[in-house]
Swiss-Prot record:
It comes from Desulfovibrio desulfuricans (strain ATCC 27774 / DSM 6949 / MB). Belongs to the bacterial ribosomal protein bS6 family. One of its GO terms (cellular component) is cytosolic small ribosomal subunit. This is Small ribosomal subunit protein bS6. The keyword rRNA-binding applies. Binds together with bS18 to 16S ribosomal RNA. NCBIfam families: S6.
């Protein structure tokens, strides 16, 4: 299993319940694709350096997880289809991390 980090920039117009729903959807996808969630870090509302979709603020969420490489493709496919996600980036943190086997 590899270790990944995905940083999401969510719309500031999403309610708290909708943000929680979006994050729980993505964590569900990670677990469904045989991944292991390590951390969900809500960075909160922050000012942006430049306007994104004519807005100057965004809500950041950082996901750290382990899983096989195809998991990232499925997660990113779902992120692209989700309304309210402005931008995202996924980074591989480590190769072959010893993870829990279910």
């Amino acid at each position: 299993m590899r270790k990944f980090e995905t940083l999401l920039l969510l719309s500031p117009e999403l309610s708290a319940e909708n943000r929680e729903g979006v994050v729980s959807t993505f964590t569900g996808i990670i677990e469904r694709e045989k991944g292991v969630m390590e951390e969900v870090d809500n960075w909160g509302m922050r000012d942006l350096a430049y306007p994104v979709r004519k807005l100057m603020r965004g809500y950041y969420v950082r996901l750290v997880y382990q899983g096989p490489a195809p998991l990232v493709a499925e997660l990113e496919r779902n992120i692209r289809m989700t309304d309210g996600v402005f931008k995202f980036v996924t980074v591989k943190l480590a190769d072959e991390v010893a993870g829990e086997v279910a």
